[in-house]
Curated annotation (Swiss-Prot):
Belongs to the XK family. The keyword Isomerase does not apply. It comes from Pan troglodytes. It is found in: Cell membrane. This is XK-related protein 5.
Length: 686
């Protein structure tokens, strides 16, 4: 089917471009120089498309030979992409890398073809439609050119939608009937819109630009109100809204990952109202109804009717998720569903548990270490494990700026990393060029997980816990992959005496005295438990990002779904030998985080960046010392380098470590025991 779609796209493009060139020559040979120069000027925006195609070739690793430059100067760069994609599609039994590369080639081709159609074919369609109507349907050359341009622009929209959907994980094959319905939908809506604008221009001339400008402005503000998260940069986000608002003058494209039923209905209702008003004004129907005016209005609006019927048929019968769409419409019409907002809510159970933990956090006041489980795109294979943080972060930024990463975000209609990681699981890696190695994320994680389990417990010296925490992995046979956003807060409290602990909180730990001594050693106190310097310690906040898997614990039936972390009684800075940690304590599920996937996130405090830890007075840690305990992690996986991001919000008294479910605000006063059981509770964001 790939070869057939590529062949159909090439055939329509060849017919449209041939008709366009013949129309230009026809105008010059017949002495209609104005139309000839206007038709020739429409070709100029095509150089922007060719420039983008050339830059994308270079980004994919193609050498910038003179032949490649000449092809793009002759506006044949898109044709070269057609040729390359056809060669890849016609290979017998292509391997998985070739299939992934074919998807990227088709995505590049469909995006460039859509851009070329909007910049060249759209203006040419409007121009030739006006010339054809001005000649009272007698000039056959502009009429044929109008037909091919109309079909080509509609197919460019269908092809873009199809190939973007093909990049989604778990996609289903789209039958030819679905493509035919989409083509009728696009042609019907485009035909009505183009005829309305051209007829209004014939009657009111340049006032049509006022109408188009007002429509552009309204659509741009509407897009801003919808808050699409595909683009991260503020400047680029504004430019994106302006460009999409210009596209909405003619057609509709969806850029939101939420259900677009209400948006689509709103857009087409506005278009129907606007087209009807333009037709009534253009045909002088308000001054006096005539049979000719009625025929014109009915003929033009019949295209909108055909497009609407095709749209309904496609989404109700031929869409890959037509059953879910139909059931959603029925639930909403019956009042069962509460709308799109209910589909975006977090898990009530997780929210309730997080709320309870926040309310019962007690009087422990101290540093907060937040572990936000989010996905990160892996770094290239070319980056050595000993490379510094700056090098690997630069490589990651280069990956995120690659145009193939933009296709992933456009296909999923979101730029949220957690949503993208939730969509692309272990069995459906993101397809990227071989140089980026994104499809090898599963192998890296599996190797890191297995290597981490092989580490002996004796090698985990307590001194290494000054800058990092060791967590046990979860076996894939015992865990279901599920995208979570979890918060782990390490609060520390300092007390002169060892606090009273309940049995549940002290399971797997040392004695209370040992715990108090450990905290004293951590905070730099003397033997008597007094602080050095007499002043409150500055608290620090570590922010990390990691991927996680939620384990299904069968032994905790009947209890709240709380993932508990194995805590071994080793304390920061403890001088006495630590008890070996049990890999799987009874009743405690292992922490579902892979150390090889942890990467830093900048804190929210006033002092952001790499800085010495304030929790160890009298000693300044260098960057190399901070990264030293994490070197085994880098050896396990060439992931983004893990650093320690510190934010020093205020002076506090240091307290003993305590693990809670949500990050605590620095101003919250609590009254709980400071030796509380370490827990990790997932919060789901869909």
């Amino acid at each position: 089917m790939h070869a057939g779609l590529l062949g159909l796209s090439a055939l329509l493009q060849a017919a449209e471009q041939s008709a366009r060139l013949y129309t230009v020559a026809y105008y010059f040979t017949t002495g209609r120089l104005l139309w000839g120069w206007l038709a020739l000027a429409v070709l100029l925006p095509g150089f922007l498309v060719q420039a983008l195609s050339y830059l994308w070739f270079r980004a994919d690793g193609h050498p910038g030979h003179c032949s490649l430059v000449m092809l793009h100067l002759l506006q044949l760069g898109v044709w070269k992409r057609h040729w390359d994609a056809a060669l890849t599609a016609l290979q017998k039994e292509p391997e998985a890398p070739h299939r992934g590369w074919l998807q990227l080639q088709e995505a590049d081709l469909s995006a460039l073809r859509l851009l070329e159609a909007l910049l060249q074919t759209g203006p040419h369609l409007l121009l030739q439609t006006y010339v054809f109507l001005a000649s009272d349907f007698t000039d056959i050359v502009p009429g044929v050119s109008t037909l091919f341009s109309w079909s080509s622009l509609s197919w460019a929209l269908v092809s873009y939608t199809r190939f973007m959907g093909f990049m989604k994980p778990g996609h289903l094959a789209m039958p030819w009937a679905a493509l035919f319905c989409q083509q009728l939908w696009r042609m019907g809506m485009l035909g009505t819109r183009v005829m309305s604008l051209v007829l209004f221009y014939k009657a009111y001339h340049f006032w049509v630009f006022v109408v188009a400008g007002a429509h552009w402005l309204v659509m741009t503000f509407w897009l801003v109100a919808q808050q699409s998260d595909i683009i991260d940069s503020t400047c680029h986000w504004r430019l994106f809204n302006l460009l999409v608002g210009a596209v909405y003058i003619l057609c509709y494209l969806s850029f939101w990952d939420s259900p677009s039923r209400n948006r689509m209905v709103t857009f087409y209702m506005v278009m129907l109202l606007e087209n009807t008003i333009l037709l009534l004004l253009a045909t002088d129907f308000l001054q006096g109804a005539s049979w000719t005016s009625l025929q014109t209005i009915a003929g033009v609006l019949s295209g909108f009717l055909i497009g609407s019927v095709s749209l309904v048929i496609y989404y109700s019968l031929l869409h890959p998720k037509s059953t879910d769409i139909w059931q959603g419409c029925l639930r909403k019409s019956c009042g069962i569903a509460g709308g799109d907002k209910t589909e975006r809510r977090a898990s009530p159970r997780a929210t309730d548990l997080a709320g309870k933990r926040t309310e019962s956090s007690g009087s422990c006041q101290g540093a907060s270490y937040e572990l936000t489980i989010l996905g990160k795109p892996p770094t290239p294979e070319q980056v050595p494990p000993e490379a510094g943080l700056g090098t690997q972060v630069a490589v990651e930024d280069s990956f995120l700026s690659h145009h193939h990463w933009l296709w992933v975000k456009l296909a999923l209609k979101t730029g949220n990393m957690s949503k993208i990681n939730a969509a692309f699981g272990d069995d459906n890696p993101v397809y990227c060029p071989p140089a980026w190695g994104l499809s090898q994320q599963d192998d890296l994680q599996r190797k890191a997980l297995s290597a981490q389990r092989e580490l002996p417990s004796s090698s985990r010296h307590p001194s290494t816990l000054e800058n990092s925490s060791a967590f046990e992995g979860v076996s894939k046979a015992e865990a279901d992959p599920l995208e979570t956003s979890s918060y782990v807060s390490f609060a520390s409290d300092q007390q002169d005496e060892a606090p009273t602990q309940n049995p549940a909180a002290t399971q797997g730990e040392g004695t209370p005295k040992e715990g108090a001594d450990a905290v004293s050693g951590t905070q730099g106190k003397g033997t008597g438990g007094q602080q050095r310097g007499g002043e409150g310690q500055q608290s620090s906040t570590l922010y990390f990002s990691a991927t996680a898997e939620v384990a299904t614990s069968s032994q905790q039936e009947g209890s709240p779904a709380t993932l508990q972390t194995a805590h071994s009684g080793r304390r920061l800075g403890k001088s006495s030998p630590a008890q070996p940690a049990s890999p799987h304590p009874v009743g405690l599920a292992p922490f579902p985080a892979t150390m090889a996937d942890i990467s830093p996130i900048l804190g929210t405090g006033p002092c952001r960046g790499f800085c010495p830890s304030a929790g160890f007075p009298g000693r300044t840690l260098s960057i190399s010392e901070l990264e030293e305990p994490l070197e085994p992690t880098r050896e396990l996986s060439h992931h983004a380098a893990v650093g320690v991001w510190m934010s020093l919000p205020q002076l506090r008294t240091a307290h003993e470590p305590c693990l809670t479910s949500t990050p605590k605000s620095e101003s919250i006063q609590t009254d709980c025991s400071c030796r509380e059981q370490m827990k990790q509770e997932p919060s789901f964001f869909i």
